Design a protein with these regions (language model features):
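N-terminal signal peptide c-region/cleavage motif recognized by signal peptidases
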Residues: 6-8
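Charge-biased low-complexity segments
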Residues: 12-202
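Sec-dependent signal peptide recognition
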Residues: 1-3
Length: 202
């Protein structure tokens, strides 16, 4: 599930994903207040039901628009990571550090609250409206690097469903907290982390 990799300076900021989430959550909050005012002011139950239906439809559209923005952030992030890899190639440095099985890891990289908290947060961040599948149970293995400062980079989901893979990558890049980095000989090191995901789509 895990393997150690030596330290290199490729770091990915997930700040853009957080900014997008915060932006759309702020707009959801403002819209909810406005719809609530309109709903509370209406006395006719038929119109109240219509306002509620409009609100639900509007929020579904907001989710879809947010997903488009997150997909754009994912493409930008992957392009920037590819450019970083090209810079390493130009400097004749290896893209992937050599795996050293004999190195003893003092402490593995860990997410605050542990693996179950990470799985829960990733599941909560999934946008199911962006997944297209005839199969109800979808699986993917998500690999990424935990950098020495706890940020994540090079997220890559591998599975049979492209849309599920893309949503998995967006969800992992969007997690709210940094990891505690792996430690070798008292020093933080880059660490390859694997997260198997299974989701039932209804």
């Amino acid at each position: 599930m895990f393997c150690f990799i030596s330290s290199l300076c490729l770091s990915q900021q997930t700040e853009e994903f957080k900014l997008i989430k915060n932006y759309y959550n702020q707009h959801r909050s403002m819209l909810s207040k406005e719809f609530r005012k309109k709903f509370d002011a209406e006395t006719n139950n038929y119109y109240k039901a219509s306002i509620k239906q409009d609100y639900q439809l509007f929020m579904q559209k907001m989710d879809s628009i947010e997903n488009v923005a997150l997909t754009g952030a994912l493409l930008k992030t992957k392009n920037l990571e590819d450019l970083d890899k090209l810079k390493l190639l130009n400097k004749n440095l290896p893209l992937e550090p050599s795996h050293t099985p004999s190195v003893v890891i003092d402490k593995a990289a860990d997410y605050p609250g542990g693996i179950n908290e990470l799985r829960k947060e990733v599941a909560d961040l999934f946008y199911l409206g962006g997944i297209y599948s005839d199969i109800k149970t979808i699986k993917a293995n998500v690999g990424f690097i935990v950098e020495t400062d706890g940020r994540i980079s090079n997220v890559k989901a591998e599975g049979d469903n492209y849309t599920f893979n893309r949503q998995a990558e967006i969800a992992v890049y969007s997690v709210s907290q940094k990891f505690s980095p792996a430690i070798v000989n008292g020093n933080p090191v880059r660490y390859r982390f694997r997260l198997p995901l299974t989701m039932n789509i209804e």
